[in-house]
Amino acid sequence: MSGQGKRLMVMAGGTGGHVFPGLAVAHHLMAQGWQVRWLGTADRMEADLVPKHGIEIDFIRISGLRGKGIKALIAAPLRIFNAWRQARAIMKAYKPDVVLGMGGYVSGPGGLAAWSLGIPVVLHEQNGIAGLTNKWLAKIATKVMQAFPGAFPNAEVVGNPVRIDVLALPLPQQRLAGREGPVRVLVVGGSQGARILNQTMPQVAAKLGDSVTIWHQSGKGSQQSVEQAYAEAGQPQHKVTEFIDDMAAAYAWADVVVCRSGALTVSEIAAAGLPALFVPFQHKDRQQYWNALPLEKAGAAKIIEQPQLSVDAVANTLAGWSRETLLTMAERARAASIPDATERVANEVSRAARA
């Protein structure tokens, strides 16, 4: 489907969970001849990341309202109005055929600006519980899609766009069937790390001994303390890194993942075809729990919520999974994934632009 001459504005910001799926769709449409610009905020990760992908970015000033004091709430309508005016001016100059909202604070004023100019608004919700911005925008959107069932009652479930290198991994049977030796446990706390996993996993390693080998992504500033914790637990042989640049290579190495359950992490693990032990971040709406639940229901993962998390709970779970069980879980994870999510979202963007 050629998009020659068509213009898209992607509205996404704040976290990798919003930005990376937006980039996947942007690249897919750019390969079809679309022009793409981005709407973001200057102080969040999109400001650096998006230009590195060859996409021009425009900025508006907006931030979240959750947890802010009474003065901030009183000033909020004016701030939202100013952000809407900025977004509207940007869109009048760029003249997109369609806008794609992937979440983050920037999507709110951006979506309202597009709607006020008669530009179709397409939304994608990455999480199992809809964010506040997308709940509002769903009322005016041309098309609403969701990665997991349940965020919106009637929205189409299309999965989360994930990185091409993850989708290109060999199937679980090819990767895992002949493996022997210690079970390879990949521990991922997200780019910020997860303190609870940094504290728990060295003790888990001590309990499991030679039956596992661990690659632990500690997050920024924690590598030394986590390495020390493994050493003090008598387990200095395990690998600790601050970041993992090549997640596809890490997934290819792993037999099982112990991690948080951010939307993109869950979708990548399913696409890679890996069993997982999820420890959802304790958010008041249990967003990460709902992200992980479909894989637990599919028999591909287990969820241990943070209040129930203990060294014994993790060690007993990992010890109870044989290699045969892990392979079965990996195949179920892959079967539950939606590998063409990027294409599905891109097709809806194209459809909205032609309508």
UniProtKB/Swiss-Prot annotation:
Tell me the pathway.
Answer: Cell wall biogenesis; peptidoglycan biosynthesis
InterPro entries listed in its UniProt record: GlcNAc_MurG, Glyco_trans_28_C, GlycoTrans_28_N
Which reaction is catalysed here?
di-trans,octa-cis-undecaprenyl diphospho-N-acetyl-alpha-D-muramoyl-L-alanyl-D-glutamyl-meso-2,6-diaminopimeloyl-D-alanyl-D-alanine + UDP-N-acetyl-alpha-D-glucosamine = di-trans,octa-cis-undecaprenyl diphospho-[N-acetyl-alpha-D-glucosaminyl-(1->4)]-N-acetyl-alpha-D-muramoyl-L-alanyl-D-glutamyl-meso-2,6-diaminopimeloyl-D-alanyl-D-alanine + UDP + H(+)
Organism superkingdom: Bacteria
Q: Give the primary localization class.
A: membrane
Q: Does the keyword Transferase apply?
A: yes
Query: Where, per UniProt, does this protein localize?
Result: Cell inner membrane
GO terms in the biological process aspect are: carbohydrate metabolic process; cell division; cell wall organization; lipid glycosylation; peptidoglycan biosynthetic process; regulation of cell shape
Q: Which Pfam families match?
A: Glyco_tran_28_C, Glyco_transf_28
Q: What are its GO cellular component terms? A: plasma membrane
Give the record's keywords alphabetically: Cell cycle, Cell division, Cell inner membrane, Cell membrane, Cell shape, Cell wall biogenesis/degradation, Glycosyltransferase, Membrane, Peptidoglycan synthesis, Transferase
| Binding annotation for UDP-N-acetyl-alpha-D-glucosamine | T15, G16, G17, N127, R163, S191, I244, A263, L264, T265, V266, S267, E268, Q288
Q: Which CDD domains match?
A: GT28_MurG
Q: What is its EC number?
A: 2.4.1.227
Q: Give the way it sits in the membrane.
A: Peripheral membrane protein
Please state which protein family the record places this protein in: Belongs to the glycosyltransferase 28 family. MurG subfamily.
Task: Summarize the protein's role.
Answer: Cell wall formation. Catalyzes the transfer of a GlcNAc subunit on undecaprenyl-pyrophosphoryl-MurNAc-pentapeptide (lipid intermediate I) to form undecaprenyl-pyrophosphoryl-MurNAc-(pentapeptide)GlcNAc (lipid intermediate II).
Database matches in HAMAP family: MurG
* The protein, known as: UDP-N-acetylglucosamine--N-acetylmuramyl-(pentapeptide) pyrophosphoryl-undecaprenol N-acetylglucosamine transferase
* UniProt source species: Shigella boydii serotype 18 (strain CDC 3083-94 / BS512)
